[in-house]
């Protein structure tokens, strides 16, 4: 059953002012935002639909912190992403495949022609500027081995499952003051790590630029993600030392400002980490005992930045994603809690006086904000106006609803209803179930993605998006409720939510449907064999047979 079946479950109601499906998909939305080290500009990505290429494309924009109109920085048919400011705020490195293969490019924040820095056979992955701004480190699988090239020429291009992977390693490239746009001769990158022992993931430069801390697992295969440990490599002589090795995954290292310690994400030696709280560990740069910080935050967390003021990170608290700060030995403090906003990441300027982030309040669209953290009562100041593109339309409203599941578990969800909602009327109900299971639905408005929610509502339906057991935002105990109960407990949560809305009197229970992707698809599939109350169910990328899933998946520990 597809989306067309779902759409015709109900009659068209009140189409005036509602965006069309094409308009809903065409609305622009902000993404990654990073403030310049000098605190004067913010670079951020904007996603929009390219109907000719049949895909979403993101480009980079600049917003002046002092105010003024934002301006577009990159253009073209290929997306530009992962912007990184040089330490002197004069250049931005970003990734794009505009020449056919993903490479690292450079551009001035004032505009002009972007130039490619790298010309690697294997596209670079993550990258970071060195503290002095003279070099950039990145991850890459490097050139294709000769034996693999010979095999392709002789037998064709195929892959031997779980054998033909290539380890990702650290590379460093010098950044010249100028790179002629037309030049095919790019600076030569040098491998800093090598071999078959590990595959590099996240990394961070030491403050003095002489070392790089990185995480690495046995291989790049998903099933080996739990083997990730923390290492330090000296750039000059390429000497590698493992400094953290626990039973669970350790990843995402960041250096302390004095270069003496490293913070990282850790499962705290727990191999059963899928539903457990990820913690922040701190270890001496030379290795030693690991100290766990911010243990009082009951959510899955990891360090984003370590500055003089402390370790900054984000964490969900119910339906809000907040920004926190903690110092080793201290308790975590939530910043900007009084603003009532949910922050999608964030970045700090060099002095920690300004914070830039994409954020939103309930029933509002995400916008780019900047906050003066030195103010007595810091408040976000909006730099963009994405909401203006919705001004001619009458978008649906979001309401947070709560109910008790079959076993007494407290469940939250988002009820999406027409702007002219009348509780005395009967509406068809569509249940849209997120994936994960550690995803989360919030009362924020957003441009339509997988499902045309605004069209569903414009056609006369109400939509329930349940945060069933296992969802993010409600702590480790809540996530553990579907352990050895997957599908069953989730179904209780969905159906008890449906019953709750029916009890409020505005749901036509003869016209109900369900849909979801991944874990949401699995729950929808589970509903097909456990209830006949839905007229239509759509299963997207959902597990329908655990036995075939186990023998085919590359993440067997999830089962």
PLM segments and residue spans:
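Hydrophobic beta-strand positions that form the internal "hydrophobic ladder"
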Residues: 39-42, 92-93, 117, 133-136, ...
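Serine-hydrolase catalytic core recognition
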Residues: 344-559
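A short helix->beta-strand "capping" segment at the edge of beta-propeller domains
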Residues: 17-28, 70, 184-193
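Beta-strand-rich domains and repeat architectures in extracellular enzymes and scaffolds
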Residues: 22-58
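Short loop/turn segments that connect beta-strands within beta-propeller blades
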Residues: 64-68, 108-112, 175-178, 234-238, ...
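A flexible loop/linker signature enriched in serine peptidases of the S9 family
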Residues: 46-59, 74-81, 93-105, 113, ...
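Residue-level detector of Asp-centered blade-edge/turn motifs that repeat once per structural unit
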Residues: 37-38, 87-88, 131-132, 207-208, ...
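Conserved beta-strand position repeated across blades of beta-propeller domains
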Residues: 34, 84, 128, 204, ...
